[in-house]
Curated annotation (Swiss-Prot):
Residues 1-22 form the signal peptide. Coiled coil: none annotated. This is Temptin. Keywords: Disulfide bond, Pheromone, Secreted, Signal. Binds to attractin and enticin. A component of the complex of water-borne protein pheromones that stimulates attraction and mating behavior. Modulates pheromone signaling by direct binding to attractin. Its main location: secreted.
Amino acid sequence: MEQKRTLRVFLAVSLLCALANAYPQYQAVIPNGSSVPNPCNTSQIAQGVGHINFQGTGPLNPFGEDFKAAGKQWTTDLCDMDSDGDGRSNGVELGDPECVWSQGETPARTTDLSHPGFDEATVSC
């Protein structure tokens, strides 16, 4: 019985570690990827910018679908898109309004960011 409990705890911890480390590589390939606010609580960071669940699990949101279609890279086309239909391009929302950001560089803007996968005016939290 104790062995089963230990195994369950180990599996739960392993799963949590995997989730915590699942998407940093994607955060690094979009401007301000590790600073995108959670639209339901802007004092928190959305860990999985491309997912319905802000922790990075579950189905992809519209930005995640567009990011996947772009080869999981920041491209000018992806930057110019308005994935969530809120009237602001993904680049504007992520601090790259001119679509010139490259991985490893500091984006043109690092504050006043918004989530490119959810229209903050209509998101249901």
